Structure formats: C-alpha cells, structure tokens
C-alpha cells in the first residue's frame, strides 16, 4: 500500500489532508482483512451501500405457471406480476426444486437440491443449521433482513438447531380484513412497510414476502361472486370439464389475485421511498396448483411456476422473455453475486446473472425436480421418492419405489391426515374425480391422478404438454430415454444424491412434525441410524 509522506515544510492544509488519506487507507485495509476473515468475497467491498441492491422476494403458495395474465390466462388478473414482466425479465421455464412447500423453500434458501439437504427434503421436517442460507449470508455482510407471512414452512426449527426462521426475523404484526373467509388476515404489504420504516436507511435490505394464498382451502363461490365467468376458464386436460372444476379454479384465481394485490402494494411502497430502481423484485411461487396430478407431482402442473424479475440496474433489455431452464434454487447464488458475495461451495445451484445480462448460460439447459416424503400418507411414513429431468422437449421421471401409491394410499387409516390419496389436497375437484372415477370420460383422468406409476416415465412435450401419455419403453424414443436417464443420473451422482451414490437414505425415517389425525400413526425407525430419537 502506498502512503503519502510530505515534508514538514508543506502547508498545514496539505499535511492534514495527507494524514486523513493515510487513515482512510488504513481503515479500508482493516475492513478488507476483517471481511476476508468472515469468509466473504472481497468483491462485495467494491460495492457501496447505494450500489448493493435491495431484494424483495415475493412468493405465493401453490401457483402454477399458466395462471398469470402475462403467461396467457384470460381470467386471472395479475397486474403486479404483469408489470414486473413488462419492466423486467419473464422466465418461461422456471421450475421448483420440489413440488412440496417445505422442501421447495429449503432449496430456495440454501441454493441446493433437496437430496443434499437431509431431512429438509421432506415436508413437516426441519432445515439443519449446517446448511447456509442466503438471508443469513446477506445479513452477515451488512443487509437488513426480514420476512412476513409464510417463510420457511411447514416444520419445526429447533430440531435443526435453528432459533429463527431461515427467511429472517418475522414481521407479522399488522392484520387486515381479507376479501374472503379462507384467506389469511396477515397484512403482508403492511408488514413490509413496518420493516422498511425500521430498517437503517444506510443499509441494503433483503425481505421475503410470502403469502399463504392460493393454498387451500378456498371459500366456495368466491370466484363467481367477483364476477368471473366460469365459461372462460381454460380447463387443463388432466381435469374433467364441468362446473365443479370451473368454479374450483375460479376460487383459486381469486386467491392468486390477493397475492398479486399485496405485491402491488409492496411495489408502491418502494416507489414512494425512492428505492424501486435499486431493488431486485422477484415474483414467483413455491410450486404448482393444489389440484390432482399437479402439486406433489413432478409433472409441469406441479413443478413449473411463474417467475418474473425486475432490476433496472442489472437486467439488460428489460421486457425480454427467457426460455432458459432453471430451478428456484438458482436464486440464492444470484442474490449473493448481485450483492457482491461469492456463494459458498455447498451451493450447487447456478447464478442467473449471465441471463440477466442477456448472455448464453451453459448451466441452464435442463431443470431437475425431486420429491421424497410429502404428507405422511403411507404406512410407516414412507414417501414416494422420484427424480426428474426437464428439457425443452421432454420430461423424464424416475420413480424409485413404483410399488407405492404415488398420491398416497387409498386407505385413510395409514395416512397421518386420515384422508384417502392424502398427498392430494382435499377439494371439490378431487372429490368429484374420486366419486365418478369409474364413469366414462373420468376413469382415465382418475387413473392418472390416483393410480400407480411405473419406474420410468417419458413425455414428449411438443405433442403432450400436460404429460398424459407415457412413452417410456417406446422403440421410437429408446435413444432419447437412455440419453435422459444418463443425464439425470450423472447429475444426481455429481451432486451426491444418496439415492444413486449408495449413501445413507433416511427420508422414510426422519421424524414427521405435521399434525397427525390417525391414532397410532408413526414413522418407522431407521434400521441404519438412531435418527428417530432426535
């Protein structure tokens, strides 16, 4: 380091200036050394508080890709999402890491797939403290952090060694009268306003705004009471086309619109405070819609989610659409790199910054989705382990335990929730499909939703966008099937999935912290570890 030495004959003002510069240089050097000792990238020091972007992460609960205005739905109204699309970047092929709440959120927070996260790969579990999370790393580097609504959930923090939600300190005080009864009364945007008011102005912030909508239950008839026309609803071919399903979808749309209204209010707060253009705004969902053959499956209706990002200072040519294939876990390294931090080595997800800059990304040619135990809906707490690779043209799924019921057992006595096919949320659509499953026109749809599945599934997305015709075993696609199988298993080996590397597989035996309605229902203890005694 070069220091300034001046003769004692130099004018006093110049000597005082030189002394000030020396002290500044020493202070900067000390700060750099301290930062390195804390394990952060030196690049973050090159960004001032004004340069480091704020982060507002807005996440709905159970919303499929198709159900926004910008993504083409003619009924649901999402002006906030549509604005982020218009002023930012829309992703057409974003996928959750797992189509179930807790594991998906664990992957988002840690930047890792669920098979690397031990019990966090299950819902109603815990997220071990040894796994670094992006909010914690940002806080250590000088960010204010917080969350409102649904952060990491559902599960228990204490068994994983945590005392605070991984999304940050809670801001839950403000309440409102929701438009319909089944919606939460949390004032999500109001709590964000409280966070902004309490955060030091000189520090950047990272805030998680997570609604419980559109998670079930819904108020029956809510959609029609808002004036929505059931005849205009686009019915996915995986569902029967009738008034029951149409009105169920309308009620779901109303919940999405509540989420969008909260995002709109949050954007207005940023505009009013002058922080909008230095804030990365992300609007997305944790996984797909709470309907049969959607949520808790690896098909697109369960795993493909809306994603739009606005960041004027970091996204070139705003208004673009990207068809890159990505997972939501890619957001963690993206946020860290945007803040000038180097993601820790345990984060295997890949930053989206090259895509922000409209550069080709070799890391986003395929997405990978996985599931272990969703709700405890098989005897002894068994899950339905499966992995998938999604490319632009095909979806390949490998089911590791094809003799198990994929949507939960039809016998409610072996389900913790005491309902048949318990991994599908109760709903008018599910009830209708179960009651009329033997009727003409319903039988095949019911079999797709509730029936058994083979070890391998392969779908041609150009001819079968809702993945209804399994082509695994077809001679015409034998090469494609082999190629995708290899790509999937190579990725699982590289990222150390114990399902394929031969490591300890305990997902069927980790404790279940959800509500148990079935008397005597328990998780079978592990034959290879004492994990049940945790």
Model regions: which residues?
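Serine residues within intrinsically disordered or low-complexity segments
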Residues: 7-8, 44
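Formylglycine-dependent sulfatase
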Residues: 35, 40, 45-457, 465-490, ...
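Short arginine-rich
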Residues: 493-496
């Amino acid at each position: 380091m070069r220091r300034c030495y001046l003769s004692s004959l130099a004018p006093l003002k110049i000597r005082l200036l030189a002394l000030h510069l020396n002290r500044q240089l020493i202070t900067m050097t000390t700060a750099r050394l301290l930062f390195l000792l804390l394990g952060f990238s030196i690049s973050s020091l090159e960004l001032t508080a004004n340069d480091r972007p704020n982060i507002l992460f807005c996440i709905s609960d159970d919303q499929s890709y198709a159900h926004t205005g910008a993504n083409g739905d003619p009924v649901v109204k999402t002006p906030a999402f549509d604005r982020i699309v218009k002023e930012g970047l829309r992703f057409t092929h974003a996928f959750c890491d797992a189509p179930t709440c807790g594991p998906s959120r664990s992957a988002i927070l840690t930047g890792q797939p669920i098979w690397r996260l031990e019990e966090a790969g299950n819902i109603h579990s815990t997220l071990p403290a040894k796994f670094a999370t992006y909010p914690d790393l940002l806080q250590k580097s000088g960010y204010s952090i917080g969350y409102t609504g649904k952060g990491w959930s559902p599960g228990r923090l204490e068994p994983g060694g945590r005392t605070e939600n991984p999304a940050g300190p809670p801001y839950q005080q403000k309440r409102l009268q929701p438009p319909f009864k089944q919606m939460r009364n949390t004032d999500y945007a109001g709590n964000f306003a409280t966070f902004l008011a309490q955060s030091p102005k000189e520090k950047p912030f990272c805030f998680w705004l997570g609604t419980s909508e559109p998670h079930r239950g819904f108020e029956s008839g809510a959609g029609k009471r808002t004036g929505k026309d059931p005849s205009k609803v686009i019915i996915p071919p995986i569902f029967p086309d009738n008034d029951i399903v149409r009105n169920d979808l309308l009620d779901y749309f109303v919940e999405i619109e509540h989420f969008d209204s909260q995002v709109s209010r949050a954007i207005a707060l940023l505009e009013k405070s002058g922080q909008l253009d230095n804030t990365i705004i992300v609007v997305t969902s944790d996984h797909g819609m709470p309907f049969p053959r959607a949520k808790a499956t690896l098909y697109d209706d369960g795993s493909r989610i809306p994603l739009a990002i606005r960041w004027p200072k970091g996204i070139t040519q705003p208004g673009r659409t990207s068809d890159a294939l990505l997972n939501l876990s890619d957001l963690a390294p993206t946020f860290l790199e945007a803040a000038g931090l180097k993601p820790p080595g345990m984060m295997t997800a890949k930053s989206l910054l090259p895509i922000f800059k409209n550069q080709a990304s070799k890391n986003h040619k395929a997405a990978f989705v996985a599931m272990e135990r969703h709700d405890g809906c098989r005897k002894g707490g068994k899950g339905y382990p499966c992995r998938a690779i999604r490319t632009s043209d095909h979806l390949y799924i490998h089911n590791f335990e094809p003799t198990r019921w994929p949507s939960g057992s039809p016998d409610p006595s072996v389900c913790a929730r005491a309902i048949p096919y318990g991994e599908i949320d109760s709903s008018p659509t599910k009830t209708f499909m179960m009651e009329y499953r033997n009727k003409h026109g319903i039988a095949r749809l019911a079999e797709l939703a509730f029936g058994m599945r083979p070890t391998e599934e392969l779908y041609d997305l150009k001819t079968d966008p809702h993945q209804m015709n399994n082509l695994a075993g077809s001679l015409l696609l034998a090469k494609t099937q082999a190629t995708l199988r290899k790509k999937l298993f190579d990725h699982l080996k590289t990222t150390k999935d114990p399902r394929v590397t031969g490591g300890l597989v305990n997902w069927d035996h980790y404790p279940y912290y959800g509500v148990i309605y079935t008397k005597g229902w328990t998780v079978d203890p592990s034959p290879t570890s004492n994990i049940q005694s945790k």
